[in-house]
Amino acid sequence: MRVCVIGAGLSGLAVGRALKERGISFVCLEKAPDVGGIWRQPGAGERGPGYRTLHLNTAKQLTGYADFPMPSSYPLYPRHSQVAAYLRSFAEWAGLLDHVELRTEVVSVRQDADGTWSVVSRDADGVESARRFEQVVVASGHHTDPALPDPLPSGADSFTGTILHSLDYRDGGDFAGRRVVVVGLGASAVDIAADLSRHAERTLLSVRRGLHVVPKQLFGMSVDEIAEAPWWNEMSFAERRRWVEQALLVARGRLSDYGLPEPDHPVFSSATTLSDEILSRIRHGAVIPKPAIASFDGDRVVFTDGSAEAADAVVYCTGFHMTFPFLPAGCPVAADGSVELYRRVVPAGRPGLYFVGLVRPVGAITRLVEAQSEWVARLIDGAAALPPVKEMREEVGTYLAGIVQRYGRTAGASIQVDVGPYLAQFRESLPV
């Protein structure tokens, strides 16, 4: 077998399709009981980010695969179960299921002296086996290692309520009649706070730092359609920033009017949060903004403004660590937390190892994943070639320097990409 693909979510299936189209033999290892990745609803005993109210934040016509669109019956922003069903349908249509080994967890990936890769996996019965491959494509994402404040605020160990991470949150109905504090202002935080506000007795949203909250549509266009529009990509970075800032003022006013902290950075200097719902829930009094948590005191949560609220649960929506425990330390995440990949795909100096889907665009990721997958397949069969290692490292250094200049040293910033310019790299080097 030539290639091992790790993960059978949106990215892994795109890789499988590209390899199959080029006649490259492969196996795809997936630790879950079905394909679909983060869009699957985790079963009993499973952990996963697929809470029941999870929907796409990007429009279906740009999130579906190019030659296998999502069903016309789907809404513009399908729910997670619809996306999971769509991904399984794609796997069936593309003939990928025979290549996927389910309930198979990758334990270790190491390169041998002869350049091949030894992959150790564990099946559902706990039996480990080792196989050799010429190439390995990691498409498992980075939503498995929950990031919590370390240390938690003082008093957390004696808090009488429940403290959990969004990875373990499933349904607002589980908190019916309870008082809940949600921590964060990212995608999962605003989704979960809105969900809880329909079930919990009281829902508080604790926000340490302001982020730009962006409606899913501006002037009747989804934000991912805007990100791929020719007129958008013809504008300079400064022009795009001014356009969005003015559009946000028109669409929702200032965040301080909702009791949220104003961002301390301009648009495109940090991650944005897409939501049509959270600001409305705040306006209706269903979600109450609060500052950061300072400490816990028995059944009370004390905030940095000195106020305190009784709470039965605290849900930390504080993201994930970028970890790949089956890979050697420092690959692809350096000691400073930056992801060091040529074109956000190839770790320089590790021939035969690739990463697909380890990017964070403003807009839909699918076009990027398909471009990465096609490029990787061409690299594997020799239709494309990599530059020298020195040149790849120089590209990585230049890219990361630009990221620091634009975003600062924010966690996760090193996987941010602009859709248009990023896709252009592949179009120029791989003309169809």
Residue ranges and their predicted role:
Residues M1-T53, P69-Q217, M221, A229-M392, ...:
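Flavin (primarily FAD) cofactor-binding/catalytic cores of flavoenzymes
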Residues Q61-L62:
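Aromatic- and acidic-residue-enriched carbohydrate-binding clefts of CAZyme catalytic domains
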